[in-house]
């Protein structure tokens, strides 16, 4: 008779070891008995995916880890050391890059689990993985809202720039404090808990337990970590778009009355171009946040309030991947759209082939000086 497990391998959970068809196994087949208790029963009834799926996701996360580390590392390096970029507004960009970098720091846990086909690192590393994900995900969303607020003030109220370094730092601290309860509560199991999900290679808050507390937690965290920042982002950028269109319309009408082609001077055009490019970068990043986190939010709502049978391991890994992908893309959006960042990137890394004309952002440079003088005075 064949033994249930090899002496050199962890003991298998007998009821999860095989589906009865000989070749098929359930998720959790290679999890030690003392770790099974941490896995929601929903996943233990799902079939184990092919090993190739684990390996493919592991390779994909290696790519994300490398791209995000390099991209966000460069953003943090350049924004924190460049005098022209050291402005109160860019404190939010720096904070977003820090959250995105933190997001990618949990990738090695996922990669290790993937190449070991499951819950290999156990519950302790699962708690670390989920804590990092909660901090970075919620923090990125609220920072995007703060960026929207700042862009809203800069573009719609150009004569009332009241953002100072002190205010920016305080807002960033508030963002970190805002994230803390959503990490501490499930981490201490005071309200909900962190558990494995999908292929058991990643972890998040429990959205599958069929009880009132879990449903209340899912609904609450969905509102405060996704709905609130999304509504703020939509409001600020809708105001920006409305202001830009109405401003352009007013200028065209006035120019028509005066029989001139345009009322803008070259300096005004340059300044407007720089501001609009920065706004476009911010809008793009906020759009990416919405697109990448919406699937995960919908998935958690289905788990708590809907038909759990829809949540197959493969289906849940897609939202888990999309919300990590945005942390990789954010820095490259700035590399494409942020004029002063592109100029610094061109100076420090000429081999990247970035082509940014300093004349196009001269007004932005003077704006930076003005902001710094206002900050010093404050």
UniProtKB/Swiss-Prot annotation:
Post-translational modifications reported in the UniProt record: Phosphorylated on some or all of the serine and threonine residues present in the C-terminal region.
Membrane-spanning parts: 54-78, 91-111, 128-148, 168-192, 217-244, 281-304, 313-337
Gene3D superfamilies: Rhodopsin 7-helix transmembrane proteins
GO MF annotation list: G protein-coupled photoreceptor activity
Keywords, alphabetical: Chromophore, Disulfide bond, G-protein coupled receptor, Glycoprotein, Membrane, Phosphoprotein, Photoreceptor protein, Receptor, Retinal protein, Sensory transduction, Transducer, Transmembrane, Transmembrane helix, Vision
A GO BP annotation: phototransduction
Protein origin, superkingdom: Eukaryota
InterPro entries: GPCR_opsins (IPR050125), GPCR_Rhodpsn (IPR000276), GPCR_Rhodpsn_7TM (IPR017452), Opsin (IPR001760), Retinal_BS (IPR027430)
Membrane topology: Multi-pass membrane protein
Known glycosylation sites: 6
Cystine pairings recorded for this chain: 126-203
Phosphoprotein listed as a keyword: yes
PTM-bearing positions, type N6-(retinylidene)lysine: 324
Cytoplasmic-facing ranges: 79-90, 149-167, 245-280, 338-378
GO cellular component: membrane; plasma membrane
Function: Visual pigments are the light-absorbing molecules that mediate vision. They consist of an apoprotein, opsin, covalently linked to cis-retinal.
Family from the record: Belongs to the G-protein coupled receptor 1 family. Opsin subfamily.
General remark: Each Drosophila eye is composed of 800 facets or ommatidia. Each ommatidium contains 8 photoreceptor cells (R1-R8), the R1 to R6 cells are outer cells, while R7 and R8 are inner cells.
Name of the protein described by the UniProt record: Opsin Rh4
Organism name: Drosophila melanogaster
